């Protein structure tokens, strides 16, 4: 028992067939971003944020030149340019964006939290009132790929929530240009303000405000380690959605699942990033070997071969499990961002799942469906955070307020209990604030 060393040509991927080793390996993968460099990155980001806070646009331009290699002047992309981008993209792509927009909007409209009022028997009322934040900033990554889907997934719930002003930031390429499809998605989503800046300096601009960029109440959207660190450091004075780590998928499968489907779905994560993680929990030893073979075939001529190889080699894993119960236990411990269930009794497995950002059931539901147009948000908790949090949604862009109104009768009826509780905490002025209202 223990590890079976597998080395298929240049592809290395761990196969484990016992619970103890599986738990240790999943723990290692989950903590893959806990680097010794984190303190160094914190210091760099703190300096950037402080400069942006002090010098505003000048600091933003400085760091954009330094890290992105272009002068972002002018910083804002005009609304006409956004409209031009929409007009210029392929008609088929335009249709696909519209289909995705419609489905995502329909789902998020169901998420709108409802205000409510409870009336007490003595005339008191208590209310929960929901209101949108005034403005929000959304960060759209550049770099290895363009993500128009991320524009939709961040902008649509903000729009549905009723946010008055949405400011989008995204790093330009060396020529200072943002991908045309990303700009088209911004136009479709009704975004008026787009700035071609990225990195920690963009987060600082949104958090503190500059002459050109208004300070926002909430910042959402994924980014690299510098963006994530900046969001962590400004949290408390500005709201954020989450601290996104590298993408991850966990597939639970049995012998009925097709190995070529599994391999394709694992690679769909691996191609994102060298730190992306692709994990298979299977009840079939033969399937484990077949999936490895399929991975090699598909990676060999993949346009992002090197990224896939690094991801699979360092953060890929196959675990051969005795039964569904072990698959469920290991999955819940790992708490994946994306969970696919490709098994004959997928609904039974689903009943045991407690921790997952999003769950994809059956052979006709590859994770890519959720990435683009199923409707639920694709901004999901990573690094085990689905144990206590969920996806980005309409509530991310809203806040609630409690409204309380007592009359003389309701305060009198409840006064003794309020006084008793206040005095038990030694807060006598609290108690007196009730007593004094009934003194002659």
Curated annotation (Swiss-Prot):
<keyword id="KW-0862">Zinc</keyword>
<feature type="binding site">
    <location>
        <position position="269"/>
    </location>
    <ligand>
        <name>substrate</name>
    </ligand>
</feature>
<dbReference type="GO" id="GO:0051287">
    <property type="term" value="F:NAD binding"/>
</dbReference>
<feature type="binding site">
    <location>
        <position position="269"/>
    </location>
    <ligand>
        <name>Zn(2+)</name>
    </ligand>
</feature>
<comment type="pathway">
    <text>Amino-acid biosynthesis; L-histidine biosynthesis; L-histidine from 5-phospho-alpha-D-ribose 1-diphosphate: step 9/9.</text>
</comment>
<protein>
    <recommendedName>
        <fullName>Histidinol dehydrogenase</fullName>
        <ecNumber>1.1.1.23</ecNumber>
    </recommendedName>
</protein>
<feature type="binding site">
    <location>
        <position position="272"/>
    </location>
    <ligand>
        <name>substrate</name>
    </ligand>
</feature>
<feature type="binding site">
    <location>
        <position position="272"/>
    </location>
    <ligand>
        <name>Zn(2+)</name>
    </ligand>
</feature>
<dbReference type="InterPro" id="IPR001692">
    <property type="entry name" value="Histidinol_DH_CS"/>
</dbReference>
<feature type="binding site">
    <location>
        <position position="430"/>
    </location>
    <ligand>
        <name>substrate</name>
    </ligand>
</feature>
<feature type="binding site">
    <location>
        <position position="224"/>
    </location>
    <ligand>
        <name>NAD(+)</name>
    </ligand>
</feature>
<dbReference type="Pfam" id="PF00815">
    <property type="entry name" value="Histidinol_dh"/>
</dbReference>
<feature type="binding site">
    <location>
        <position position="425"/>
    </location>
    <ligand>
        <name>substrate</name>
    </ligand>
</feature>
<comment type="function">
    <text>Catalyzes the sequential NAD-dependent oxidations of L-histidinol to L-histidinaldehyde and then to L-histidine.</text>
</comment>
<feature type="binding site">
    <location>
        <position position="338"/>
    </location>
    <ligand>
        <name>substrate</name>
    </ligand>
</feature>
<feature type="active site" description="Proton acceptor">
    <location>
        <position position="338"/>
    </location>
</feature>
<feature type="binding site">
    <location>
        <position position="201"/>
    </location>
    <ligand>
        <name>NAD(+)</name>
    </ligand>
</feature>
<comment type="similarity">
    <text>Belongs to the histidinol dehydrogenase family.</text>
</comment>
<feature type="binding site">
    <location>
        <position position="430"/>
    </location>
    <ligand>
        <name>Zn(2+)</name>
    </ligand>
</feature>
<dbReference type="InterPro" id="IPR016161">
    <property type="entry name" value="Ald_DH/histidinol_DH"/>
</dbReference>
<feature type="binding site">
    <location>
        <position position="247"/>
    </location>
    <ligand>
        <name>substrate</name>
    </ligand>
</feature>
<keyword id="KW-0520">NAD</keyword>
<keyword id="KW-0560">Oxidoreductase</keyword>
<dbReference type="GO" id="GO:0005829">
    <property type="term" value="C:cytosol"/>
</dbReference>
<feature type="binding site">
    <location>
        <position position="371"/>
    </location>
    <ligand>
        <name>substrate</name>
    </ligand>
</feature>
<feature type="active site" description="Proton acceptor">
    <location>
        <position position="337"/>
    </location>
</feature>
<dbReference type="GO" id="GO:0000105">
    <property type="term" value="P:L-histidine biosynthetic process"/>
</dbReference>
<keyword id="KW-0028">Amino-acid biosynthesis</keyword>
<dbReference type="GO" id="GO:0008270">
    <property type="term" value="F:zinc ion binding"/>
</dbReference>
<dbReference type="InterPro" id="IPR022695">
    <property type="entry name" value="Histidinol_DH_monofunct"/>
</dbReference>
<feature type="binding site">
    <location>
        <position position="139"/>
    </location>
    <ligand>
        <name>NAD(+)</name>
    </ligand>
</feature>
<dbReference type="GO" id="GO:0004399">
    <property type="term" value="F:histidinol dehydrogenase activity"/>
</dbReference>
<keyword id="KW-0479">Metal-binding</keyword>
<keyword id="KW-0368">Histidine biosynthesis</keyword>
<feature type="binding site">
    <location>
        <position position="371"/>
    </location>
    <ligand>
        <name>Zn(2+)</name>
    </ligand>
</feature>
<dbReference type="InterPro" id="IPR012131">
    <property type="entry name" value="Hstdl_DH"/>
</dbReference>
């Amino acid at each position: 028992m223990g590890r079976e060393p597998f080395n298929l040509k240049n592809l290395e991927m761990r196969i484990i067939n016992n619970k103890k080793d599986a738990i240790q390996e999943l723990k290692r993968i989950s903590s893959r971003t806990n680097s010794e460099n984190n303190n160094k990155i914190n210091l760099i980001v703190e300096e950037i944020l402080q400069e942006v806070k002090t010098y505003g646009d000048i600091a933003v331009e400085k760091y954009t030149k330094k890290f992105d290699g272009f002068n972002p002047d002018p910083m804002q992309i005009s609304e006409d340019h956004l409209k031009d981008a929409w007009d210029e993209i392929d008609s088929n792509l335009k249709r696909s964006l519209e289909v995705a927009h419609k489905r995502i909007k329909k789902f998020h409209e169901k998420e709108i939290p409802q205000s409510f009022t409870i009336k007490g028997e003595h005339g008191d009322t208590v209310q929960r009132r929901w209101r949108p934040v005034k403005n929000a900033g959304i960060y759209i990554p550049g770099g290895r790929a363009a993500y128009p889907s991320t524009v939709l997934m961040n902008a649509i719930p903000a729009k549905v929530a009723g946010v008055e002003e949405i400011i989008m930031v995204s790093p330009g390429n060396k020529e200072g240009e943002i991908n045309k499809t990303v700009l088209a998605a911004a136009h479709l989503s009704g975004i008026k303000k787009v700035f071609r800046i990225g990195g920690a300096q963009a987060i600082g601009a949104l958090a503190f405000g500059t002459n050109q960029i208004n300070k926002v109440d909430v910042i959402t959207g994924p980014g690299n380690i510098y963006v994530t660190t900046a969001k962590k450091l400004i949290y408390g004075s500005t709201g954020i959605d989450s601290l996104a780590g590298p993408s991850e998928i966990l597939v639970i499968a049995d012998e009925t699942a097709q190995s070529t489907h599994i391999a394709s779905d694992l690679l769909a994560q691996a191609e994102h990033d060298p730190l992306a993680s692709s994990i298979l929990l299977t009840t079939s030893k033969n399937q484990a070997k077949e999936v490895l073979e399929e991975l090699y075939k598909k990676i060999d001529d993949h346009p992002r071969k090197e990224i896939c190889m690094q991801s699979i080699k360092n953060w890929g894993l196959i675990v051969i499990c005795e039964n569904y119960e072990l698959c469920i236990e290991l999955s819940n411990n790992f708490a994946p961002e994306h969970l696919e269930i490709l098994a004959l009794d997928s609904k039974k497995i689903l009943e045991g799942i407690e921790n997952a950002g999003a769950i994809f059931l059956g052979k006709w539901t590859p994770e890519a469906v959720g990435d683009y147009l199923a409707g639920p948000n694709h901004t999901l908790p990573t690094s085990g955070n689905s144990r206590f949090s969920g996806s980005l949604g309409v509530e991310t862009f809203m806040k609630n307020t409690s409204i309380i109104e007592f009359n003389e009768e309701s305060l009198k009826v409840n006064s003794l209990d309020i006084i008793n509780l206040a005095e038990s905490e030694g807060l006598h002025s609290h108690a007196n604030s009730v007593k004094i209202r009934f003194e002659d």
